[in-house]
Amino acid sequence: MSNPDALPFLTEMTVADIISKQAKHGVSFNRRNARWYVHLLKEIIVNIDRELIPLLPKMRLDGSTYMKPFKKSGALQKWPQAYCDRVGLKREDIGGAFTCVEYVDFDPSKDARVKEALMDEGFLPPEFNVSKKPWNTFEIKKDMRKYGTYQAWYTAWMRGNAKQKQTAEMVDADIKKFLEKHFRFKTKNYMKAYVFGLGLNPNRRNPVTFDEIKKALATSNKWPTAPTNLEETLEEGLGGELGSVGSLLKRRVVAAHRLGLISGLIAKEREDGKLSAEANSCATPTFRFKHRIVVNIPSRGLFGHECRSLFESDYNSDSDHSRPFVITNVVPDGCYIRKGTNVIYEKGKPGKKDKPVGAYKYYIPAGKEVFLGYDGSGLELRMLAHYLIKECRDMLAEAIEENNPAKKALAERGLASAIMYRDILLEGDIHSHNQKLAGLPTRDNAKTFIYAFNYGAGDAKLGSIVGGGADEGSVMRARFLAENPCIAILIDRMTEKAAQGYLIGVDGRKITMRRDATGKVMVHKALNTLLQCAGAVVMKYAMMFLNKWIEKDKVRCAKVIDMHDEGQFSVNRNDVQKLKEHTELCVKKAGEYLNMECPLASDCQIGLNWMHTH
C-alpha cells in the first residue's frame, strides 16, 4: 500500500527548494523612491497633526504624588517646585499633599489613544483582540437560559455548590472590572463600540441593558480588549461612518502604517540592492506560507500603489537589454482601451461607471528585465465550488448505499444547487448571485460577505457589513444557508469530520484542526481551514508544474515573490511570451491533477514592477 503522506511530503520539499532559491535571488528594491515616499509620508502626517490635534481633547497625565511637598522653611521641595513652574502654579496654591496632574496635547502616535478617539467618533471595530477567561461557559449558558437574567443566575449560583459559588464570584468580579474600565466616564459612542464587540447591536430601537451586557460577558470566555487589524479595517471602510475628526484619524493611522512599513523595508535591504522574499512554506495549520520581510504589502489605499511599485524587475547587462522598449498587455474580454489614453477600462454594468483595471502599454528602460505576475483566478470561490459538489456527491453515494430516501433527496437538492453555484461562478456574476441569496443591499456588500463567511466570520462581523450587529449577521447567515442547501450540507459534514481532530486535504494530507484553551477541537473553523488549505495546496502544485516547465524550456527568469495565490517573476525580455503561456496554464493543470470539481484558471499581467502586475 502506498503511503498517503508521500506525495504531500515530496510536494513540500520541492516547494521549499523553490522558495529557498527565490529568497537567495531576492527582489530588486527601489531604495531611492522608498526614501522619497518616507519623506512624503512624514509631511502628510505633520499636516494631518496640524489640523487634527486642536480638534481632539487634551490627554491627562498623572504624575508623582508628594505627601510632603514642603521643606522645613516652608518652601517647596525641588520636584514639586519644578512641577509648579511647569504648569504655572504659585506657592500659595499648594496647601498640602498633592498629585501632579498635567493636560497635554493629544498624541496621535500612541496607538491606544487613537483607538479610543476613533471609538469616541463612532467607529465600531468589527474585530477585537480578546482576553481569555478560565471558566467553562457550557453550564453557564444552560443555566442563564433557565433563569433568564444575569442577576437571577448569579443569585442561584451563589446559593449553589462550592464550585458554582466560586465561579459566580470570579465572573462577577471580572465583569465589574470590565464595566468600570469600559463603561464608566466614557462617551456614548465608546460604549457602543464595546457593546458591538460583545456581539450585541448598539443601534437597535430598544437600548441594550446592562443585564444583557453582563449576560454576554458571563456566557463568553473571550472578552474584547482593544480593536485589532485597525489599518485593514479602516481601509476596507468597515466600522461605520466617521465624522471629520474620525476621517483624519483614519488617514493618519494608515499613513503611519505605510511609513513604518517602508522604513522597515529600507532597513532590510541587502548590499546588492535587493530584499530577500523569504517564506516558510509549511508553517501554518492550513499549509499557507508564513512570510518574512516582504509581507502585508498593500495594493490599494493611501500609498498602496507606491508600496507595490518599490518591487521591480532585475537589471540585465546583456546586449538584448541595451535599448528601451515598450511591452503591450492583452485587453481582456469585457474591457476596452479608452480613446486618447493608455488605460484599460472594464465595462460597468447598467447604471455603473466603467472602472480602470490597468495600463495597455508599459515603457521598459534600457537594462531592465520585465516583471511578470500571475495569480489564481477567483481561487477561494472555486475551492468552495469544488467542495460543495464533492461533498454533495459523497452524501448522495452514502444515501444510495444506506437506502435512505430522505438523505438522498437532500443530497440531490444540494448537488443541484452546488452545480448551479459553479456554473454561475464560471459563466455569470457570482457576487450578484450571493447578494440576492443573502439579501444584501449592494454587490460590494456581497463580495465582502462571501469572503468573510468563508473565513469563518462570526455573526457580529457579518452584521457589520451592513452596519448592523450580531442579530443582523445571524439573519443574513440563516438566509444564505437556507437558499444554498449545498453550503449547509458542506458545513455540517465538515463540522462532523473535524471533530476527529483533522480533515483530509485535496492531495490526501491531514489538516490538523486548531483547539481552544480547554483542548476542544474548534469545529466551527472547519470550513475556513478546509478552503484555506485547498487554495494553498493548489497553488503549490501550480508552482511545481510552472517550475518544471521553466526548466524544461530553459526560460530565462527568476522567481522573486510568492504571496499566497500569486507569484512574481523577473524575466528576460525575449522569454516573456513563453513564461506568460506557462503561467496561464499552471493553475489549470494543478486543478486537473488534483481532480478538482471546478475548473481552475489563472490571470497573468506584465509590467515593470509589482504595482503593474497585481
UniProtKB/Swiss-Prot annotation:
Checking InterPro entries in the record gives: DNA-dir_DNA_pol_A_palm_dom, DNA/RNA_pol_sf, DNA_polymerase_A
Q: Name the reaction it catalyses.
A: DNA(n) + a 2'-deoxyribonucleoside 5'-triphosphate = DNA(n+1) + diphosphate
Gene3D superfamilies assigned = 3.30.70.370
Give the signal sequence positions.
none
Positions of transmembrane segments: none
Q: Which GO terms describe its biological process?
A: DNA-templated DNA replication; double-strand break repair; viral DNA genome replication
Q: Which UniProt keywords apply?
A: DNA replication, DNA-binding, DNA-directed DNA polymerase, Exonuclease, Hydrolase, Nuclease, Nucleotidyltransferase, Transferase, Viral DNA replication
GO MF terms listed in the record are: DNA binding; DNA-directed DNA polymerase activity; exonuclease activity
Q: Which Enzyme Commission number(s) are on file for it?
A: 2.7.7.7, 3.1.11.-
**Family, as annotated:** Belongs to the DNA polymerase type-A family.
Per the entry, what this protein does is: Replicates viral genomic DNA. This polymerase possesses two enzymatic activities: DNA synthesis (polymerase) and an exonucleolytic activity that degrades single-stranded DNA in the 3'-5' direction.
Q: What name does the UniProt record give this protein?
A: DNA-directed DNA polymerase
User: Native species of this protein?
Assistant: Escherichia phage Phieco32
